[in-house]
A protein has these predicted regions:
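N-terminal "arm"/small-domain region of PLP-dependent enzymes with the aminotransferase-like
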Residues: 2-58, 146
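Conserved core of the PLP fold type I
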Residues: 56-177, 181, 186-187
C-alpha cells in the first residue's frame, strides 16, 4: 500500500543539489567545499590539546548559549540579537523560512550560490533571478523591482566577484521594507 504524504508533493518538486566535481588528489585543497589551505593556528592547536576528550562524546548545549553569549559580548549586542546554526546552510534555511514568506518573489543573481533556489523551491518561495553583467557584477537596477526580499553572496560564489559597498548600499536603500541578506560566507 502506497501512502502519499502531503509534504511529498513539495519535496518531489525540488531539484536535488548536485555538488561540483570533486577531484580525488591528495594534495588538492578544495575551496569550494570550504577546505582551509592553512594548518590550524597555534592557539587552536593548543586549545585542542587542552580539551577534555571525554566532552567530545557529548552533544553540545542545544541552543549554543555559551557561544551566543560570547559573540554578543564581543560584538556589543544583546544575546537575543545573535543567531547561530549548525553551519551556513542551516542559517540560510532558517533565514528563508523566517524572512521570505510574503508570497512575493525574492531576488538573487542568476549565477550564484546554488542552494538559494533549492531553499526557495523547498519552502515554496517564488523567486526571480537577475542576470549579472558581462563582468559578472550585479546591476542594482534589477533589485529595485517589487519583491519579497533579496539575497546575494559577496563575494559571489562561484564567480568570486566582490561588489562595492556603494552598490550594496544602493540595493539596501531601494529595499527599505524587505529583508536584504548579504551572504558573506566566503569573506
Amino acid at each position: 500500500m502506497v501512502i502519499n504524504m502531503k509534504w511529498e508533493e513539495n519535496v518531489r518538486k525540488v531539484v536535488p543539489y548536485v555538488a561540483g566535481e570533486q577531484p580525488n588528489r591528495p594534495n588538492m585543497i578544495k575551496l569550494n567545499t570550504n577546505e582551509c589551505p592553512y594548518p590550524p593556528a597555534p592557539g587552536v592547536r593548543k586549545a585542542a590539546e587542552n580539551m577534555e576528550s571525554a566532552a567530545l562524546r557529548l552533544y553540545p548545549n542545544s541552543n549554543a548559549q555559551p557561544l551566543v553569549d560570547e559573540l554578543a559580548a564581543y560584538y556589543g549586542v544583546k544575546p537575543e540579537q545573535v543567531f547561530v546554526g549548525v553551519g551556513s546552510d542551516d542559517v540560510l534555511s532558517m533565514a528563508f523560512l523566517t524572512f521570505f514568506n510574503s508570497g512575493k518573489p525574492i531576488l538573487f543573481p542568476d549565477v550564484t550560490y546554488s542552494f538559494y533556489d533549492v531553499w526557495a523551491d523547498l519552502y515554496r518561495i517564488p523567486y526571480h533571478t537577475c542576470a549579472l553583467d558581462e563582468n559578472w557584477h550585479m546591476n542594482p537596477e534589477d533589485y529595485k523591482q517589487h519583491n519579497g526580499g533579496v539575497i546575494f553572496p559577496n563575494p559571489n560564489a562561484p564567480t568570486g566577484v566582490e561588489e562595492s559597498q556603494e552598490l550594496i548600499e544602493e540595493i539596501l536603500q531601494a529595499n527599505p521594507d524587505v529583508v536584504v541578506i548579504v551572504d558573506e560566507a566566503y569573506v
